[in-house]
Amino acid sequence: MKKFVLIFVTAVAVASVSVFAAYNLPENTDASKYENTHTMASTVINKKPAEFTTSPNVDMTGFELTKNSPSKLNLKCVDEYQEECFPNNAYHPKVLDLGKDGWNGYRYWVSYTPYPQGNDEYENPHIVASNDLINYSEIKFSQPVLSDYKKGRCFNSDSEIVYNNDLNRLEIIWRYTDYDINYASLLMSYSYDGNTWSKPETFFETYDRVKEDMVSPGIIYDSGTYRVWYVNAYKVKYREFKDGKWSKIRMCKLPYENDAFTWHIDLIKNNDKYEILTCATEDKQDRKHMNLYYAKSDDGLKFGTAKKVLEPTGNDFDWDGNGLYRSTFMYSDGMYYVLYGGRNDAKNFGVGLLFGKDMYNLYGTNCDYINDGVNSAGKFWRFIDQYKDFSSESEISEEGFKVDG
């Protein structure tokens, strides 16, 4: 029998400095375009992203690795009543890692759309920020309920955030549709400080929604060009937007190991490769019970075979027990981090957190990210520090211990 030795002996401490956040617009910017879409709880931000330091006081007792994430992340709906009734029912996440220096006080910026009990009236884009992927800021941005909302017909969805490094601003892009007039669009708001946002502008629109709708856009900003991957008719397609003009539609090749059909995507560029994370269904009539798949490409158009990397737990009582949805990922310091969308058939929705050295060996933890965020962050990042030193997956057991002999 193998012996497991607990290797955690240090803790995590967070230090921050409160400063005044100056709001600087580029020259010749029309300031009247800016308005707060949500009353902010505080104007205090971290001067620098929080850095984790070692401490002898961490208690890793009971820490375990899991296949999925038993705890959701603490991503809230701006509507307090909906949040009280259906807590942390976030969906369709997107995460950006803006590096160790961060942007306006935070390293990680996350967008999502609340989906309380599957109610698309509240499926409006939200943004929060974090320095540890577990403890989040107040809501930085949210769109109100649409005045012309029609259930299943006219609604917002599918938010995506982009960092425009030429203008040093964060941009959120989301989908708006009106099925009754065959209309679909992508709207954009942007901010130079993360707190004050422009009024929505039309980024893309069409009155031929069936043929040209951009479902679940995955966007990379590259030297003045928006490179946009999206889903239409269960196919991944690609267009570019530059100097106010859209390129022609190009088809992407994305085969599946089980002939599944793509529904939603996220895409990153990593080490000169394009990597895609999808949720896909084997039955076009069922987009509730899906798995996650992953593939790579040299050119962003022809991908290798997409293989399954995560599935629901199969337990009806788990928040992610019956289906997975649009998920997002990033690669940082030799590690993948995945914020994944999940649901069960009782209409409980949420976003969980996974990590791994590769996309085929992902782990969750048994930490309670909602009710014990500070301690959970300490344990999570201390384990990550140790895990980076492991030479192979065989050195780690399901309980998060290093194998000794």
Q: Which positions does each model-derived feature cover?
A:
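Hydrophobic alpha-helical membrane-insertion segments, chiefly the h-region
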Residues: 14-23
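Carbohydrate-active catalytic/glycan-binding domains of CAZyme proteins
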Residues: 26-405
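Hydrophobic alpha-helical membrane-embedded or membrane-associated segments
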Residues: 7, 11-15
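Positively charged n-region of N-terminal signal peptides that target proteins for export
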Residues: 1-4
